[in-house]
UniProtKB/Swiss-Prot annotation:
This is Elongation factor 4. One of its GO terms (cellular component) is plasma membrane. It catalyses: GTP + H2O = GDP + phosphate + H(+). SMART domains: EFG_C. Keywords: Cell inner membrane, Cell membrane, GTP-binding, Hydrolase, Membrane, Nucleotide-binding, Protein biosynthesis. GTP binds at D19, H20, G21, K22, S23, T24, N136, K137, I138, D139. It comes from Gloeobacter violaceus (strain ATCC 29082 / PCC 7421). It comes from the Bacteria. Residues 7-189 form the tr-type G domain. It is an enzyme of class 3 (hydrolase). The keyword Cell membrane applies.
Length: 602
């Protein structure tokens, strides 16, 4: 392959809210430019994980290099860097946008601008990208292009004259989009002569070649056989293979500034090649890494336990393999009295957690029990140290701590006017602090709240969708820790605390949560031969209690009439037996009880 002049390269990504047609548009571009032959084309070509196709979401990033001969007769190289559209993966989106000079903003002509569209547009503006608005799905009977163009102009502030009307499904407007990419998106800066700086925007694990790193060369050039260094981790490797992505890999000898490609260098751990890190040459290193690198921090935690304890090692192996591909997944072994051995796992958000659980069950054939999702709490202890608590069972007793801080998020809800009241009620019910309310158009409103993350990670999203009949959309970002009046609620069964059912909750809500939990457990725990009290306690103070009535045999059945003292003797004997049984009996909590409690909390 011949070296391409930098002026002929265009790097762009596609940003859109879920279901606005991003993957279909990518398919059309690949097809029209002849990158993927019609014979090999499958719907959503770039979403190559089954789960991605099923849920219709893009989880892992992909990249594709297309060759396009424009109307002016020049041949251009277009690099499409695909972005995940979901809020959990914001960091990945920001890195892939940093690897581009322009972006196609895809907006559904019937839905209009949604919360995540906006969030990603702000990221694109921060990275100084040229944004080309594309009105997708104009062939739908419900399309209202004029209204949506007004929204694009009013909410985002892009000129409506520059918007392209298209239908990715029908192939309308694709040529105009390609021309706009060539003529409106600027070429990369010509920095071939400078030391190598390349931005990693994705990496994945290949069983034969180790970690494959996807990157964009920002300055300098890189060849096969070069020794490279990852600047954040400090690790050094020699390049075995370097190439471009058409989405399949094609080896080349050299890549220079502005190009996008992949490297294989016998890297063992994804953690060594993290998204956002800078690659440079050992022989002629860059003075500074590229800005914007962050370690992926898990936000939501939950316990994963195999239903069959023999599968513990299989689960460890599966998590090891998944973490090869997912640097944001953290896990460490933990054991619980009720569930046996398992792992405490950290995720970027709820979707990330669901995706990981589903992949474990589907790809590794495991049966899992998951504990309720929780967040990290910061505990300020009396001796001045700060402890980070992920598992409610690890919370130090109240006399050893001065305060507990919990993470807060800024939640932005975009909703049609008529649902504002019910969504405000939902946010305030979740201890939300009202910050701002803006009218985007006469019929659409943005609500901005600050809400504790613990209240958002359960079923906030589902509630928001059902209260707004699916029309509202949300976006959240972490804004830091704040002190709160938090307590640990323990469930005590027959005098024994059950560690896996503990949860940290706000003091005002604790009695209510306790009542719901005990009532639910009463339905689910099978009756024993003796009475079983279920209590919800904060420290030593019981806030809710239910009793499970005992099963009893009718010991008087064989007494016909007869003396009352005879009956009394038999009843006393039964009572003593029950008492003895209660002191030595243990209550097993069935798995359904755990699941139900999660549903209640979740």
């Amino acid at each position: 392959m011949t070296a391409v002049p930098v002026s002929q390269i265009r790097n762009f990504s596609i940003i859109a809210h879920i279901d606005h047609g991003k993957s279909t548009l990518a398919d059309r571009l690949l097809q029209v430019t002849g990158t993927v032959s019609d014979r090999n084309m499958t719907a959503q070509y770039l979403d190559n994980m089954d789960l991605e196709r099923e849920r219709g979401i893009t989880i892992k990033l992909q990249a594709a290099r297309m060759e396009y001969v424009a109307d002016d007769g020049e041949k251009y190289i277009l690099n499409l860097i695909d972005t995940p559209g979901h809020v959990d993966f914001t960091y990945e989106v920001s890195r892939s946008l940093a690897a581009c000079e322009g972006a196609l903003l895809v907006v559904d002509a019937s839905q209009g601008v949604e919360a995540q569209t906006l969030a990603n547009v702000y990221l694109a503006i921060e990275n100084n990208l040229e944004i080309i608005p594309v009105l997708n799905k104009i062939d739908l009977p419900g399309a209202e292009p004029e209204r949506v163009l007004d929204e694009i102009e009013e909410i985002i502030g892009l000129e409506r004259t520059g918007a392209i009307r298209a239908s990715a499904k029908e192939g309308i407007g694709i040529h105009d989009i390609l021309e706009a990419i060539v003529h409106r998106i600027p070429p990369p800066a010509d920095t071939v002569a400078e030391p190598l700086q390349a931005l990693i925007f994705d990496s994945y694990y290949d069983a034969y070649r180790g970690v494959i790193v996807y990157f964009r060369v920002m300055s300098g050039s890189v060849k096969k056989g070069n020794k490279i260094r990852f600047m954040a981790s400090g690790k050094e490797f020699e390049i075995d293979e370097i190439g471009v992505l058409k989405p399949f890999q094609v080896p080349v000898d050299e890549l220079h500034a502005g190009e996008v490609g992949y490297i294989a260098a016998a890297i063992k751990l994804v953690q060594d090649a993290r998204v956002g890190d800078t690659i440079t040459l050992v022989s002629n290193p860059a003075a500074t890494p590229l800005p914007g690198y962050q370690e992926a921090m898990p936000v939501v935690f939950c316990g994963l336990y195999p239903t069959d304890s023999d599968q513990f090692e299989d689960l460890r192996e599966a998590l090891d393999k998944l973490s090869l591909n997912d640097a944001a997944l953290h896990f460490e072994p933990e054991s619980s009295g009720a569930l046996g051995f398992g792992f405490r796992c950290g995720f970027l958000g709820l979707l990330h957690m669901e995706v990981v659980q589903e992949r474990l069950e589907r790809e590794y054939d495991l049966d899992l029990v998951t504990t309720a999702p929780s967040v990290v709490y910061r505990v300020n202890k009396t001796d001045g140290t700060v402890l980070e608590v992920q598992n409610p069972a690890d919370l130090p007793p109240s006399q050893l701590r001065t305060s507990i801080e919990e993470p807060y998020v800024k939640v932005e809800l975009i909703t049609p006017q008529e649902f504002v009241g019910t969504l405000m009620e939902l946010s305030q019910g979740r201890r939300g602090i009202f910050k701002d309310m803006r009218y985007l158009t006469p019929t659409r409103t943005t609500l901005i709240y600050e809400i504790p993350l613990a209240e958002v990670i359960t079923d906030f999203f589902d509630q928001m969708k059902s209260r707004s009949r699916g029309y509202a959309s949300m976006e959240y970002q972490l804004i830091g820790f704040r002190e709160g009046n938090l307590v640990r609620l323990d469930i005590v069964l027959n005098g024994e605390p059950v560690d896996s059912l503990s949860c940290i909750t706000h003091a005002d809500k604790a009695p209510e949560v306790g009542r719901q939990l005990t009532a639910k457990l009463k339905e689910l725990i099978p009756r024993q031969q003796f009475q079983v009290p279920i209590q919800a306690a904060i420290g030593s103070k019981v806030v809710a209690r239910e009793n499970i009535a005992p099963l009893r045999k009718n010991v008087l059945a064989k007494c016909y009439g007869g003396d009352i003292s005879r009956k009394k003797k038999l009843l006393e004997k039964q009572k003593k037996g029950k008492k003895r049984m209660k002191s030595i009996g243990s209550v097993d909590v069935p798995q359904e009880a755990f699941m139900a409690v999660l549903k209640l909390e979740g």
